[in-house]
C-alpha cells in the first residue's frame, strides 16, 4: 500500500505571521513529503508493505520506523495547529492541566521550557497518561508516544527545520 502526504487542514499561508508560507512550503512540502517518499521506497517486499501507518510505527525499527514515525508525528503536528486559534482549553483537558500545573499559563510556561530544553532534534508532547493525568514528554528524533501507553494530545516539532527560516536559531521565540 502506497502512503501519501496527507493534506494540510489549512492553506500554506494560514499560520502567518507565526509560521510563514515559506516555512510550510519547505517543512510540509519538502521534509514531510520526503518521509512519505522514503517510506514508500523502503516497504515494498517487507512485512510492512500493506500495514497502516500506525501499525508500521508500532511494529518497525530503523529507517522504516524513522520515516513512518516522522510522517505520523508531522501529521499530528499539523493538526495541532490552526489559524486564529489558541487560548485555554475547557472541560476535562482544562481540569487535568489545572490539576498538574495549577493553571493554563503555568502549563504553557512548563511546556515551552521543556521544548526549549529538548536537546537536539525532536518533539515535545502533551500526553494523557494511563491514569488519566497529563504530562509533558520530550522525545528525540522520530520517537513518538504512539509506541508507549501515553496518548498524545498536543505536540510541537522542535527540529530546526520547523523554525529556522522564520526564527533562525531562536527556538524559544518560535515556541512563543
Which residue ranges define each predicted feature?
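Feature for soluble, non-membrane regions of globular proteins
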Residues: 1-176
Amino acid at each position: 500500500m502506497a502512503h501519501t502526504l496527507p493534506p494540510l487542514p489549512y492553506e500554506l499561508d494560514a499560520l502567518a505571521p507565526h509560521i510563514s508560507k515559506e516555512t510550510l512550503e519547505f517543512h510540509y512540502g519538502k521534509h514531510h513529503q520526503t518521509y512519505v517518499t522514503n517510506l514508500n521506497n523502503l516497504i515494498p517486499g517487507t512485512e510492512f508493505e500493506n500495514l497502516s501507518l500506525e501499525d508500521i510505527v508500532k511494529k518497525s525499527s530503523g529507517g522504516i520506523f524513522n520515516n513512518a514515525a516522522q510522517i505520523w508525528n508531522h501529521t499530528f503536528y499539523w493538526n495541532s495547529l490552526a489559524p486564529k486559534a489558541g487560548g485555554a482549553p475547557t472541560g476535562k483537558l482544562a481540569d487535568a492541566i489545572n490539576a498538574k500545573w495549577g493553571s493554563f499559563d503555568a502549563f504553557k510556561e512548563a511546556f515551552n521550557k521543556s521544548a526549549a530544553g529538548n536537546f537536539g532534534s525532536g518533539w515535545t508532547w502533551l500526553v494523557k497518561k494511563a491514569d488519566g493525568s497529563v504530562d509533558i514528554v520530550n522525545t528525540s528524533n522520530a520517537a513518538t508516544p504512539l509506541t508507549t501507553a501515553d496518548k498524545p494530545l498536543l505536540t510541537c516539532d522542535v527540529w530546526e527545520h520547523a523554525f529556522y527560516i522564520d526564527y533562525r536559531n531562536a527556538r524559544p521565540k518560535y515556541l512563543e
